[in-house]
Amino acid sequence: DFPQNHLDLLTGKNLNIQGIEIKADGKTFFWQGRYHNDMNTRDTLATELNVLADFKPVVPESYRSAEVVLLGNLHPLVQLDVIAQMTDPKILMLDTMNFWMEHAWDDLLRVMAKVNVISINDEEARQLTGEYSLVRAAKKISEMGPDHVIIKKGEHGALLFHQQDVFYAPALPLEEV
């Protein structure tokens, strides 16, 4: 269900799509949610893994020496498989969400032990650590592996924690979202 014209749009912008795999008989991953008025809180209404349920990534040879790797929000076992195919990235960044905390906790902890950066929202940081204070949550997350912790705060921007340092990036206030 991924039309060729979408791929053409990417290649037309000179983007390398060598690593894209298309399963003709499968449906794309689907997530549906509802954001509250503050745009910080969300409710997951549906998560359908579809083709990602049995996805086995094959990282193209030309990508394996990448210095920066962003592990997309996929099952932690898929993320571990990608890590195993990389040669020696300088920055290994993890994106995850509450779904994986609820369905693949042990595997998620294994991934976290291997990465040096994690990007997570405030609600998920609290869920992951059991801490309400984001400073304490970031410290606990660092103890799990990543030495750089990015906590996204929706309309309030984001926080970057590294050892004792904290960097705050405010959000740009918008009249309409």
Labelled PLM ranges:
Residues 15, 89-91, 115, 147, ...:
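A structural micro-motif
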Residues 68-139, 157-158:
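Conserved beta-alpha-beta core of the PfkB/ribokinase-like small-molecule kinase fold
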Residues 64, 113, 144:
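Structured loop/turn residues at beta-strand edges in well-structured enzyme cores
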Residues 22-24, 96-100, 123, 172-176:
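Short, acidic/turn-prone active-site loops that include or flank metal/cofactor-
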Residues 16-20, 91-96, 167-171:
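Short hydrophobic/aromatic-enriched beta-strand-loop microsegments
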Residues 35, 120, 171:
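Active-site donor-binding loop signature of nucleotide-sugar glycosyltransferases
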Residues 1-70, 85-89:
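Conserved N-terminal subdomain of the carbohydrate kinase-like
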Residues 134-177:
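Conserved phosphate-binding/catalytic region of the ribokinase-like
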